[in-house]
Swiss-Prot record:
GO biological process: mycothiol biosynthetic process
Catalytic function, reaction form: 1D-myo-inositol 2-acetamido-2-deoxy-alpha-D-glucopyranoside + H2O = 1D-myo-inositol 2-amino-2-deoxy-alpha-D-glucopyranoside + acetate
Disulfide bonds: none
Signal peptide (UniProt feature, chain positions): none
Key words of the record: Hydrolase, Metal-binding, Zinc
Keyword Zinc among record annotations: yes
Organism: Thermobispora bispora (strain ATCC 19993 / DSM 43833 / CBS 139.67 / JCM 10125 / KCTC 9307 / NBRC 14880 / R51)
Its EC number(s): 3.5.1.103
Gene name for this UniProt entry: mshB
Domain of life: Bacteria
The name this protein goes by in its record: 1D-myo-inositol 2-acetamido-2-deoxy-alpha-D-glucopyranoside deacetylase
Cofactor binding, per record: Binds 1 zinc ion per subunit.
Similarity comment: family membership: Belongs to the MshB deacetylase family.
Record NCBIfam families: mycothiol_MshB (TIGR03445)
Amino acid sequence: MADRRVLFVHAHPDDESIETGATIARYAAEGAHVTLVTCTLGEEGEIIPPELAHHAADRDDTLGRYRIGELAAACAALGVTDHRFLGGVGRWRDSGMMGAPSNLRPDCFWQADLDEAAAELVKVIREVRPQVLVTYDENGTYGHPDHIKAHRVSWRAYELAADPAFPGGEPWRIAKVYHTAQPRSVLRRGVEAMRGADMPFTRVASVDELPFGCDDAQVTTEIDARAHLPAKFAALRAHATQVMVHEPWFALSNGIGREVLGVEFFTLKAGTPGPRVAGVPAGEGGLGGPRLLETDLFAGIG
């Protein structure tokens, strides 16, 4: 068993690459055991290439199966060799955006029984025994029901996995739990850089137009994975039904450009913080400023 083991829990194929791709690639390259759990197949996603539009949920409804291949290619690019779908392939369906009729499907992830879904994640935790768990914040980053449910399932599994009274395998206490974070100052720099950039995507006028972002003060941890940007770009390109790439930018089906980050940010929500040091300067993609940050998800773990 590898000395360092980290579990990433994401809602759909492509989320792992967009939010944590560089971090995943860095730890995989360093020899850590990286486990990726994806909660749905992403069946309700909007499709970018016209020639693949027939896979859509309101047509052939085969997008989920197609995206399995995209995710496999992304995992290969990132160096992930341990990937699982929560509860098995297709156990829970993509719920679609908040308020969509697909939220009401009994087989969608949003409608999943919390303890039932968490029990499936407990199986993974007790098998892999990760020291670190990474998932989303309470709002699921931007309010998507599957992201919110992934957050809830992750935290319930974190509790149950450590409970000796919960059946199925030896208990395991995860040492540190992180939420992904997208600090507004970093997003603001990206918005400003796009104003004069040569790219085919839509530019937003202000960071306030983006449906995500957190106060800089919430960030506790900064992972410098700039050396692994090529892997992140390759993983993003693998998700061709969902992502368009024009380095150093990318866009989803809404066409709004965003910067691909090689420095990724997190908030420690459970566990003891490790040593904090000066991070990457703001001019090089980091948070910058006088605050000291963790620079390793495993910092402080004995």
